[in-house]
């Protein structure tokens, strides 16, 4: 799907948790396509470049921004941590249950919990806080089914 940005000044309010920011619609064609695909009314939008959504300053430096991400623009997890969790589960789960942006291999289990930063090439990323344990981990992203046993969240918080 190729999306074109609407050549209009229209802005829409988009809410992520308790934060409302202005968003720019893509096009009616894109909205129709995603609505048909989902079987429900939906819209494609992108962040208004003139709008700012600040990251929680309890975990980041003042002035750091995020767009429509939950709290931070990236989520880091190690393969070793997932492998360790799967050893404790009756039915293993895939990495996509955690919707990571970066998956690191070759570490010990939970090594990433103590990292303050990582470097990929010349780019340095701050590791600011562990990810909050979220009910979304109980939803299979391929099927959209909720795990009736509450796993893997039950094991993670247990």
What is the role of each PLM region?
Residues 1-158:
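Metal-cofactor-dependent catalytic cores
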């Amino acid at each position: 799907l190729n999306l074109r940005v609407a050549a209009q000044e229209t802005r829409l309010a988009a809410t992520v948790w308790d934060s409302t920011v202005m968003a720019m619609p893509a096009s009616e064609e894109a909205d129709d396509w995603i609505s048909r695909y989902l079987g429900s009314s939906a819209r494609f939008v992108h962040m208004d470049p003139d709008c700012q959504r600040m990251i929680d300053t309890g975990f980041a430096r003042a002035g750091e921004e995020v767009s429509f991400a939950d709290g931070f623009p990236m989520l880091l997890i190690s393969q070793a941590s997932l492998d360790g969790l799967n050893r404790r589960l009756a039915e293993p789960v895939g990495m996509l249950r955690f919707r990571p942006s970066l998956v690191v291999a070759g570490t010990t289990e939970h090594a990433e919990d103590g990292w303050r930063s990582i470097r990929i090439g010349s780019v340095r990323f701050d590791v600011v806080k562990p990810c909050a344990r979220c009910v979304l981990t109980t939803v299979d992203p391929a099927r959209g089914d909720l795990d009736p046993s509450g796993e893997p969240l039950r094991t993670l918080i247990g």
